[in-house]
Amino acid sequence: RDKIGVMFGCGSWYTNVTLADGSTEKLGKIVNQKMDVEVLSYDFESGQIVPRRVTNWFNNGKAEEFLHFKVDRAGSGTGRGHASLAMTRNHLIRTPVGWREAEDINVGDRVMLAQPRLLSDQQWEIVLGSLMGDGCLSPPVRQDSESARLRIGHGAQQSAYFDWKVSLLANIPHSRTVNGKGAAFVDFSPLAELHELRSAVYLGDGKKFLSEEYLKGLTPLSLAIWYMDDGSFSLRSKGLQQRTQGGSGRIEICVEAMSEGSQVRLRDYLHDTHGLDVRLRKAGAAAKAVLVFSTAATAKFQQLVAPYMAPCMAYKLLPRFHGRSMVTPQFVEPIMELMPARVTEIESKTDYPIMSRFDIEVEGSHNYFADGVMVHNSPETTTGGKALKFYASVRMDVQRIETLKDGTNTVDNRTRVKI
């Protein structure tokens, strides 16, 4: 545009601003008292949420209307099931594709919400291994919530292993139950950071889908969890004689819960990445898919995972690999990160006891969080005049999730596109 004007996008008195220590304060109170405070703000250069000083305060007079938004927040049942903010129609709110005016956002759209990331690298590895085995990612109580809940269950005879695994995830809020047969289950609090993983693994056909990217994320700890969950070991020799020194045996791991393509990719991954001689076969009257390791591959695989096995699972190892377990819990302090969150409700408000419109200016980064939702700060500019051209852009994240083959020839790719 040739001309620059001024606009007065603002928030209501009652909108909670997230302060640097994680607490909140009413926007109107911050402005009226010109509070010298630091707020949380997103730094585009570092890609981190950081504390920033408020450098100016604005009361721009009475507003005729505010748009009150409710935004889904992971952790339903903790009293923080949604974020809440009220803005004028022209206030800028951050979305996954950039800044948008409040009036252009609809129910079902996504905005950027600061949410805690709780999982350490070690715990992420455990999640990946558990999903390949006895674990699952279930939807939260609110089906439209963009989070996922990790659930793990084991029979009564594996109670020690169950306790060991839960101890590695003990900092995540959870509840434990036991059924009539003595089987134990643990349900962890929904986490926003697991939503994308759940979307990638469960495609709606009842089988778990493991992409090439998923397999690249596996570590020896992930493989150990998978093996302890679904693997069996047949010890053929304890190695008491010289010709069988060190012992020998064979591993079989059930992969029936995975899609056929995932079974093949996993077999190829084990061969190409770890040099393991592994084949797929159908086992038993139910013809369930299992991965069968050769004797040499069994020893090589167990050498890889032995340091990450639970002590109570030593019976799944050759005798020479006993006593190598060295896993200890690795917890991290929660880190606030921007994550897309769904708008669940928008309501026009014209009857607040205080209808004045307020805003603040934030040092350097010029944004702050309204109850966790990223919004722009003042001062802002109006539309001006003499518009020459208008542009619209949509960002698409295209990922290859499967290579389709005809025999050994690659004929196509299966992709997922996220708008």
Curated annotation (Swiss-Prot):
Its main location: cytoplasm. GO terms for molecular function: ATP binding; ATP-dependent activity, acting on DNA; endonuclease activity; single-stranded DNA binding. GO terms for biological process: DNA recombination; DNA repair; intein-mediated protein splicing; SOS response. Pfam families: LAGLIDADG_2 (PF03161), RecA (PF00154). Keywords: ATP-binding, Autocatalytic cleavage, Cytoplasm, DNA damage, DNA recombination, DNA repair, DNA-binding, Nucleotide-binding, Protein splicing, SOS response. This protein undergoes a protein self splicing that involves a post-translational excision of the intervening region (intein) followed by peptide ligation. Disulfide bonds: none annotated. It is found in: Cytoplasm. InterPro entries: DNA_recomb/repair_RecA, DNA_recomb/repair_RecA_CS, Hint_dom_C, Hint_dom_N, Hint_dom_sf, Homing_endonucl, INTEIN, Intein_C. It comes from the Bacteria. PROSITE patterns: INTEIN_C_TER, INTEIN_N_TER, RECA_1, RECA_3. The keyword ATP-binding applies. One of its GO terms (cellular component) is cytosol. Signal peptide: none annotated. Belongs to the RecA family. NCBIfam families: intein_Cterm, intein_Nterm. Can catalyze the hydrolysis of ATP in the presence of single-stranded DNA, the ATP-dependent uptake of single-stranded DNA by duplex DNA, and the ATP-dependent hybridization of homologous single-stranded DNAs. It interacts with LexA causing its activation and leading to its autocatalytic cleavage. This is Protein RecA.
